[in-house]
A protein has these predicted regions:
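Juxtamembrane extramembrane loops of integral membrane proteins
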Residues: 4-49
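Conserved, well-ordered alpha-helix/loop/beta-strand core segments that scaffold catalytic motifs
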Residues: 147-191
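Extreme N-terminal "leader" segments
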Residues: 1-3, 153
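Surface-exposed patches in mature extracellular/periplasmic domains of secreted proteins
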Residues: 52-58, 89-94, 184-196
């Protein structure tokens, strides 16, 4: 199983974090390791807020590993882990988080559901931000089903590198406020602000 690497942060010129990571979890089940299917179904329904039909479909599916839900809040993932249910795996994952909301969002861009950059700086600097994923290595039988008694080996992921940019968060926030005021006052469809050094253009 793959372990996602923590994505590199995006910092402003003063080191203020504009794009960060929030730890979440991915919950999966391994059919041939489940000992109490009805208990597993009940807990997945209760903790993940999915329907009994959906939980049962995942639990009863014959596959090496079946993902039940991604981007699960870490507190929920920790609770599920505490049940210590045979055949239920809770892996830590990361979700992109922007502390200042949509500030400079057209420049920063954003990531998709797989945490890969799809627009803006997030995609332009994907190679340095993404890091290298790790792996959980397990032994499977001829059908690809994990052998529970064989144990597993973990190869840790390598986090992505941080990216420091020339934007100043304070100036950007001030410019955003001025643009909003001008847009409202002039009843404009859109507003653009250009910052320029008057000495050299």
């Amino acid at each position: 199983r793959s372990i996602k690497a923590a994505r590199g942060r995006i910092l402003d010129r003063n080191g203020v974090v504009l794009a960060d990571n929030k730890m979440v979890c991915t919950v999966s089940v391994i059919h041939n390791q489940i000992e109490e299917p009805e208990q597993v179904i009940a807990i997945l329904v209760k903790e993940l807020g999915i329907s009994e039909e959906e939980a049962r479909k995942r639990v009863e599916k014959y596959s090496s590993i079946e993902r039940v839900k991604s981007n699960v809040d870490k507190t929920v993932g920790d609770r599920i882990r505490e049940y210590d249910l045979a055949g239920v795996k809770v892996d830590e994952d990361y979700k992109r988080y922007y502390p200042y909301g949509d500030l400079a969002s057209k420049v920063l861009g954003f990531t998709g559901g797989d945490n890969q950059g799809i627009i803006g700086l997030e995609v332009v600097y994907e190679e340095i931000l993404q890091g290298d994923p790790g792996m959980i290595l397990t032994i499977t039988d001829a059908k690809g089903i994990e052998v529970d008694t064989a144990g597993e080996r973990r190869v840790e992921p390598v986090p992505g590198m941080d990216l420091r940019i020339s934007i100043d968060r304070n100036i950007q926030e001030y410019a955003t406020q001025l643009a909003a005021q001008a847009c409202a006052t002039k009843e404009a469809d859109s507003v653009y602000i250009v910052a320029m050094n008057p000495q050299n253009g």
